[in-house]
Structures are given as C-alpha cells and as structure tokens.
Amino acid sequence: MQKKAVLFDLDGVLVTTDDCHYRAWKQMADEEHIPFTRTDNERLRGVSRMASLEIVLEKAARAYSEEEKLELAERKNRYYVQLIRKLTDAAILPGARETVIRLREAGVLTAVASSSKNARLILTQVGLLDLFDTIVDGTQITKSKPDPEVFLKAAELLHKNPQ
C-alpha cells in the first residue's frame, strides 16, 4: 500500500505570526509617517509582501518609486525576521504539533507548503522543523497563493500525485 501524504500551510495552520507581521509593518509605516492599524493589517492576510506594501502605501502622503518600494519591503522583512527569531513554541497553534506527530506515527508523509520565504526559520524557531519530510517555501516558487504551485511542488517532492 502506498503511503499517504498531508500538506500543511504554515501561518494560520501550524503557527501564528500575525503579531510579528503587524509589528514589522507598523514599525516601517511609523518610520514613513504612514498611518497603520491592526484593521489595516487584516487586509494583508494571504497577500504577497509587495502587494501588502501597495496596500500600506495607499495611506501614504507621497508616491514611492519602485526602488523605494523594494527598500521598504526589505526593511519590513528585516524587522519581521528580527521578531520571528524570538518566536517560541507558544506560537504553535493548539493541536498542530500533536496532529503532525499522529500522522507521522501512522506512516503518513508530511510537508509544509508555504509562500513565506521565512518558513524554515519559523519552523526552526518553534521546534517543528524535524516533523516534516519536505518543506517548500517562497524561495522555491515563482507564484504566490492562491496559485497552487507551492502545493504541487510539495506533492512532487513527496512523489505524490495530487488528488
């Protein structure tokens, strides 16, 4: 019998990094004198970094060049990485670790399929990295969700045909 596989998204499924994202965007926005609230942050869920930046810049008092936008996105990510380096297993969502462990004990292959370019760092910080047979992150794909590329790549690495 062929082994089954389960693919997990990262943020909002296994862990929560919402506050880290909010604080990083808020710091960057404050430095640029752009109003940014938790309500604004909700609009950024599931949106790529550059698309998120465009949403943040909707409230900016001035226009930004493409070069400036790239710098702002990089700055936000530097702040975000500083914050996720401080994550602990408290960021793991209830039942996530236990679910993955039970699946592995049952012989099911497991993978993380995340658009985040920081997925491995997050998994390492919270102590989940070793629970997965493969990890596909934003460094390995060209299209962000909702495009299925990240999930198809994870299935391919597990030698599975998606169903």
For each predicted feature, which ranges?
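Short helix-capping segments at alpha-helix termini
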Residues: 31-34, 60-63, 127-131, 159-160
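Active-site neighborhood of HAD-like aspartate-dependent phosphohydrolases
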Residues: 1-42
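Residues at secondary-structure transition points
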Residues: 16, 43-47, 64-67, 71, ...
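Substrate-recognition "cap/lid" segment bordering the active-site pocket of phosphatases
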Residues: 89-90, 113, 117-163
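Short alpha-helical
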Residues: 20, 48-51, 98, 117-121
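A metal-dependent, Asp-based hydrolase signature
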Residues: 46-83, 94, 102
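Short acidic capping loops at alpha-helix termini that bridge into adjacent secondary structure
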Residues: 37-40, 65-68, 130-134, 162-163
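Short, acidic loop-to-helix structural element flanking the phosphoryl-transfer center
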Residues: 2, 82-112
